[in-house]
A protein has these predicted regions:
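Carboxylate-rich, polar loop motifs that coordinate divalent cations or form catalytic acidic clusters
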Residues: 1-166
Length: 166
């Protein structure tokens, strides 16, 4: 992070390694609190251009984490597209050059989160023009020069999404 710490996602929470002190600190979910991690199993971590961490969890959606102040914002699954994720199982996350987030889910396809409008858009298998070949997303790669996202799926092969044209 911007403070020189190393963040490690595990099945048992988020761990911060302080290189100066050599000490670890563990962050786990607590069902009794509405703050903190939504789920302790961390599948992916992305540090955005502001230095904040986006954490993809297994069954807890996405957690936006400010490491300097240790503040979490939770993004969970929703039945309404604009309001949340299509699936709580998040395995891959990338940030585009506009600071927006692309979230690969297991079973819920690709989710786009517009940070300016705070709305989601879902790309699902078999859902018309913006569909992808399978809703189980295993890999994401962003090409900033061409503004293309490559989407690797389980059983559906490789998909190409030009984010300029949709």
């Amino acid at each position: 992070d911007n403070l020189g710490n190393i963040w490690i996602g595990t099945f048992n929470g988020l761990n911060r390694y302080n290189k100066t002190t050599g000490l670890f600190q563990n962050h786990t979910s607590n069902e009794m609190q509405n703050e903190g991690l939504t789920h302790s199993s961390i599948w992916c971590i992305v540090k955005d251009n502001q230095g904040t961490l986006w954490l993809g969890t297994y069954f807890g959606g996405v957690n936006y984490f400010n490491p300097e102040y240790e503040i979490y914002t939770r993004y969970k699954a929703s039945i309404h597209e604009k309001e949340g994720l299509s699936s709580p199982v998040v395995g891959r996350t990338i940030e585009d050059k506009n600071g927006n987030l692309w979230i690969g889910t297991e079973g819920g396809g690709l989710n786009f989160y517009n940070r300016r409008t705070r709305e989601f858009k879902w790309y699902l298998a078999g859902q018309g023009r913006n569909s992808i070949s399978h809703s189980n997303v295993k890999a994401l790669y962003y090409d900033p020069a061409k503004e293309i996202i490559w989407i690797g799926t389980h059983l559906g092969g490789l998909n190409k999404l030009d984010i300029r044209t949709g």
